[in-house]
Each structure stands twice: as structure tokens, then as C-alpha cells.
Amino acid sequence: QAQKSVSRCFEDGKDWQTPSGSFFTTKPLGQEKIAFVYPGGFNTYVGSGNSLFEMDPELHERSLSYSSKIKTLLHPEFLFPQSPSIQSEEELKQLQQQFYDSPNPMFESGISSAVLATQVMRNAFGIEPHAAFGYSMGEVSMLFSLGVWGSMDPMSEVLNASPLFHERIAGPMNSVREYWKLKDTDFQNESLWSWYTLRAEPELVTKALEKRER
């Protein structure tokens, strides 16, 4: 969708913007300056970055300076599934949902993918940023990608040892259950927590929420 929309921008001269915040214009405000932008969590998807190592044959060797277990951090079982395991579009959707429901693999693959993509931009294409910024988890990706921080291995160890994304705000979401005083058996077959983009005035949303128990 992004590829089609960007192409259309050159045809009709209009900007492209999505509800999630993606933006493209053929008329940038500045000239010749380049910024690397690093997105937040949950931005990787099945098949993303599958051509990076082809673009830059030396990428794997350089990646070892960022992690001694780069393959593990990329989570190839999600990013690069073997074709015999995916036989239909429905199976692909199921794998993507499983990926989305696995915060730690999603975060680790997102950060390590950002590191690799930055390496390709700088070493294979010779593009150096004049500035960089990251949103949420993107701050972590930015600091690792640009060499401000060293090895990603300690980050992975802390992430996997912490209960935060295993059961506090993911999985059974025990933090939410404790705050709302819910039982373990509540919300077993329905969504406990969701977020939405609402195109409405804050006052209208606040008023509508007054009728809700939670």
C-alpha cells in the first residue's frame, strides 16, 4: 500500500499521510539534509528485511559487532519462515498475528532489523544522516544502530528476564487485572485491553467514556 501511495504522490502532487502517522511528500521543507527515523515497537512483520543480506554481502560479519547471537535476535521463525511451513494466505496471517502477540520477539527483531538496515544505508549505499530521532522503542533502535550503545546482548538478557512483557502488560496482562480487580478466569476468550485511533474531539470521547464501567 505504501509503495502504491508514494508512487501516486508523484503523479498527483499530493502528500500522503496515514492515521498511524506515516507521511510522504514530494515537496520537502528542506534540501539536502537526511534524517534517519526509527519507529516504535511492533513495526516488524513477516518477511520484512528479507533482502538486506543480499544488498550487503558483508552485513552478517559486521552485525557480529552488535551481537553474538544476531540470528536469535532477528527471530527468523517469524521474519523469514521457510516456505513449506506457509502454504496459504491464511497461514501467513496467523503467523503474523502470532508474531504480533509475542512482544519480546517483536521488540528484539525490530531493534536488530533497524541496526541492520542502518548498516546497509551507511555502508552499502554510503548514506550518512545529518540527524536521527526515534519514537518510543525507536530511541533504543537509534542508539544501537548509530553506535552510541554497544552490544545488544545485555538488552536481550534484561528484556527476557523481566516479567514486564511476559505477563505484566502482555500475555495475561496481570497489571491490568490487578488494577481492575479481575479474576484470572475473566476475559479468557475476549480482548482485555486494546487501543484505538479516534478521530473525535476529546470532550466527546470523555463524555462517552462516562457510561463505561472501565
Q: Where are the regions a protein language model picked out?
A:
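Helix-enriched interaction subdomains in cytosolic or periplasmic regions
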Residues: 1-15
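Short, intrinsically disordered, charge-balanced linker/junction segments flanking boundaries
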Residues: 1, 209-214
